[in-house]
Amino acid sequence: MTNIRKSHPLMKIINNSLIDLPAPSNISSWWNFGSLLGICLALQILTGLFLAMHYTSDTTTAFSSVTHICRDVNYGWVLRYLHANGASMFFICLYLHIGRGLYYGSYLYMETWNVGVILLFAVMATAFMGYVLPWGQMSFWGATVITNLLSAIPYVGTNLVEWIWGGFSVDKATLTRFFAFHFLFPFIISAMVMGHLLFLHETGSNNPTGIPSNMDMIPFHPYYTIKDILGLLVMIMSLLALVLFSPDMLGDPDNYSPANPLNTPPHIKPEWYFLFAYAILRSIPNKLGGVLALVLSILILIIIPLLHTSKQRSMTFRPLSQCMFWLLVADLLALTWIGGQPVEHPYIIIGQLASILYFLIITTLMPLAGLLENRLLKW
C-alpha cells in the first residue's frame, strides 16, 4: 500500500513541499528566514483577526477601541503588542532574507525574485495601512504625509489623492478603507507566498557556494525541519522578550495621543522599518524627485539580476563584492538612523550622501567589482 502522504492529493503537495523535498546538504542558517517569514505571516493573521474582533474603524472610536483592547479585553495587551512587534520581527526577517538573496546570488532565480519584490511592496503597503489604524497623532499625520506624496504625480495627482482619501482630507472614509485593505492584504500576500514557493520549487534552492547541488541533496524532513525549529525558537524568544519587557521600544510616543488635525507633531516619521526609504525621500528637495527616489529605492531590486556581472553566482569567494555588500548594509543602517533625525544640519547632507551612495553601490560599484574579479581570475 502506498503511503497516504504520497498518494492523497492534498497531502502530496505538503509532502513535496515540506517533507520529501530534496534540499542542498550545505545550506546555512541564512536559509531559515523563509520559514520564519511564513510563521510571522501566520502569527500576524491570527493576532490581527482577534484584534479586528474588538477594533472599530471609526475616527471617533478607533483610538478608544485600541485602549479598550489593552485595558479590558482578556490578554488584549498581549495581542496588540504581539501584532505591533510581530510586524517588526516580520521586517527584520524580510530584510535578512533579501540580504541573503543579494549575498548568495539567489536573485538569479528571476521568477522567485520578482514575486519576492512584489511581496515586499505588498507587505510594506499592509504595514503602512496598519500603522494608521490606532488613529494616534503619528497614525494620522503619517497617513496624511505619505498619501499626499501621490499628489506629486503630474496631472492626475490631486484627484488620485482625494480619491484615496475619500474626501478632501484624511478622515473617516480613509480610516474605514485602510482597515478593509489592511484586513484583506495578508490573504493576498498568503496567495503570493504560494506563488513564490511554487517558483522556488521549480528550480530548487540555491546554496552558499552558488554551485548547482543536484548531486548532493538531502530530504527536507527531518534535517531542515529541526534546523527551522531552532530558528523559530530564537525568533519567538526575541519577540516575547520584546513584547513582555519593552513593548513600546520600537513605537512612537506620539501615537499615544489621539489624532488631532489641528496640531502637527514636531517630527513626523514612520516606523523604524521604513526609515531608510523615508531618508531617501527627504534627501531630495523636489517633491516629485523625492517620490521617484522613494519608489526606486525598493524597485531597484527588480533590476539586480540584470546587474550581475560576475561569472560566479555567490559572493562567498569574492572579497571585493563582499566589501561592496557590507558597505551597502552600513549605508542602509546610516539611512535608517538619518530617517529618524530632524531635518537640519548636519543630518541633511549625511542623508543626501548616503542616498547617493545607496544607488551608486547597487548600480555601479557592485557590477564593477564583479567585472574586476573576473579580470583578476583571468576569466
Curated annotation (Swiss-Prot):
CDD domains recorded: cytochrome_b_C, Cytochrome_b_N
Chief location category: mitochondrion
Membrane-crossing residue ranges in chain numbering: 33-53, 77-98, 113-133, 178-198, 226-246, 288-308, 320-340, 347-367
Binding site for a ubiquinone: H201
Gene Ontology biological process terms from the UniProt entry: mitochondrial electron transport, ubiquinol to cytochrome c
Family matches, as Pfam families: Cytochrom_B_C, Cytochrome_B
Name this polypeptide is given: Cytochrome b
Gene name as annotated: MT-CYB
